[in-house]
Amino acid sequence: MVMTDPIADMLTRIRNANMVRHEKLEVPASKIKREIAEILKREGFIRDYEYIEDNKQGILRIFLKYGPNNERVITGLKRISKPGLRVYVKAHEVPRVLNGLGIAILSTSQGILTDKEARQKGTGGEVIAYVW
């Protein structure tokens, strides 16, 4: 089956696993999904991730993170730029999510960056998702 938006599929799988408090989940791997998982790990939204080779495209196993009382670290995920409606921003228009409590993930000419990194580098790009 052909998937029209693999990034939205990844975010939905994370959201669903998080809602039922699963420890881990698996998604078909790609370079951009690995970079998004790396940002989520670096920003403290997931515990870890690993790439598993399966002689096809590979699998990305993501380990979710919860607080000491089993509260969710990720309270929301939203896909912004979709295949039917791409959303681009200039360097001075890079959005803040919940006044800095969340992150915006952007695809730029310098790779996949958070909103903070994009502002520091003075670059805009396609707004992939918001995470808070």
From Swiss-Prot:
UniProt cross-references to PROSITE patterns, sorted A to Z: RIBOSOMAL_S8
Gene Ontology CC annotation, any one: ribonucleoprotein complex
Disulphide bridges: none
Keyword Transport: no
Domain of life assignment: Bacteria
Keyword rRNA-binding applies: yes
Database matches in Pfam families: Ribosomal_S8
PANTHER family the UniProt entry points to: 40S RIBOSOMAL PROTEIN S15A
Subunit structure: Part of the 30S ribosomal subunit. Contacts proteins S5 and S12.
Function: One of the primary rRNA binding proteins, it binds directly to 16S rRNA central domain where it helps coordinate assembly of the platform of the 30S subunit.
Protein name: Small ribosomal subunit protein uS8
Organism: Geobacillus kaustophilus (strain HTA426)
